[in-house]
């Protein structure tokens, strides 16, 4: 099932808010539609929104081209549009990474161009490269993650939220590893937290694993402790939306609680994320901006009110797991282990030397 596809002048996105009961697509012909799709979680997952935003910049360049102003002013409009795209989801660093990468490329080549048509062509090529890279690095992450389970069979994995094909341009980050273990005949079952309040685990993770014939058991978030206590979980694998230079990990709300439970039960807690998820400007997770979402996501479920009117609501979209709780970080360049400041620093050297 394709979740992101660029067709001439149109970005086609699988509307993940309709899953699992309806397969519907959003056709974006304007960059604002892309921004709205990201904000409203029609497309979600840190790598996926980075890919979507890079395609959205093509539409932004096309709109700027329609402005009857000098080329320099059209470029200014494009840069302004790009900043708006970046602001749609402040926690997921992949979004800003993709937008900044594309805009930096435009600025590096702008002196050799004289029209927004040329700019749009350049952005199109780069967006396609970003998408293709995501597919490739998902495979490499899956292979790297599988090395953590060499010689083991009947493996039972717990995951939180959705870090699968629906969250990326490829196999997925956490679920890419799961798929590799399944392919190797090592996987017994995946336990998927439903992931309140928007049920990404129930609606998306359980959906895509079931569609692929991978054994999956759905549990409510407050059942994770029970599953661990009963010896049903061998390892936890989650994705990430931002990782600091210390190895602190921002991911979907509830991830921190799962990590604490895993530590208490001596269960390894793995994070799978590409290089683009690392924020080298931040050392501590306390500095990661946490997106706060609307109250109705907590007080209603599928349009049905589940709480009294007028109550206070706390609805952070993410929490931060301290690096001390992370057993290893799985990347496309291999597995990182503590000391994370050293291993993440080496990762940066490897990638930037290419």
List each model region and its residues.
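Short beta-strand segments
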Residues: 14, 52, 96-98, 158-162, ...
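Histidine-anchored nucleotide/phosphate-binding helix
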Residues: 172-183, 259
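Conserved phosphate- and dinucleotide-binding cores of soluble alpha/beta proteins
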Residues: 195-354
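Long amphipathic alpha-helical segments
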Residues: 2-113
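Ligand-binding beta-strand-loop-alpha-helix segment within the catalytic cores
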Residues: 94-156, 186-188, 192-236
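Generic structural signal for well-ordered, non-membrane alpha-helical segments
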Residues: 27, 31-34, 46, 50, ...
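Conserved phosphate/anionic-ligand binding catalytic regions in large, soluble enzymes, centered on
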Residues: 40-56, 89, 95, 162-170, ...
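Short, hydrophobic/aliphatic alpha-helical segments
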Residues: 26-42, 76, 147-151, 155-159, ...
């Amino acid at each position: 099932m394709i979740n992101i596809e660029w067709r001439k002048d149109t970005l086609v996105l699988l509307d993940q808010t309709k899953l699992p009961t309806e397969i519907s697509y959003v056709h974006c012909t304007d960059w604002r539609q892309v921004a709205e799709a990201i904000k409203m979680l029609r497309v979600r997952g840190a790598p996926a929104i980075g890919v979507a935003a890079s395609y959205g910049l093509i539409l932004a360049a096309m709109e700027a081209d329609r402005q009857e102003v000098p080329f320099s002013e059209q470029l200014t409009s494009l840069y302004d549009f790009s900043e708006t795209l970046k602001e749609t989801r402040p926690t997921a660093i992949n979004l800003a990474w993709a937008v900044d990468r594309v805009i930096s490329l435009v600025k590096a080549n702008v002196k050799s161009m004289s029209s927004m048509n040329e700019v749009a062509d350049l952005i199109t090529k780069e967006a396609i490269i970003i998408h293709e890279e995501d597919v490739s690095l998902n495979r490499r992450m899956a292979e790297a993650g599988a090395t953590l389970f060499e010689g083991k069979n009947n493996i039972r994995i717990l995951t939180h939220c959705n870090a699968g094909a629906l969250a990326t341009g490829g196999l997925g980050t956490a679920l890419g590893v799961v798929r590799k273990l399944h392919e190797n005949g090592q996987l017994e079952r995946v336990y998927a937290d439903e992931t309140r309040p928007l049920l990404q685990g129930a609606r998306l993770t359980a959906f895509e694993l079931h569609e692929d014939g991978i054994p999956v058991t759905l549990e409510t978030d407050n059942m994770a402790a029970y599953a661990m206590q009963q010896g049903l979980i061998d390892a936890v694998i989650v994705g990430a939306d931002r990782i600091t230079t210390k190895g602190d990990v921002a991911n979907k709300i509830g991830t921190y609680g799962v990590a604490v439970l895993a530590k208490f039960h001596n269960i390894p807690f793995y994070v799978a994320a590409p290089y683009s998820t690392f924020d080298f400007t931040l050392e501590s997770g306390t500095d990661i901006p946490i997106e706060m979402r609307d109250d109705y996501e907590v007080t209603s479920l599928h349009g049905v009110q589940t709480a009294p009117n007028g109550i206070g609501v706390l609805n952070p979209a993410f929490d931060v797991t301290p690096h001390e709780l992370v057993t290893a970080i799985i990347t496309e360049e291999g597995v990182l282990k503590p000391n994370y400041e050293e291993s993440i620093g080496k990762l940066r050297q490897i990638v930037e030397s290419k």
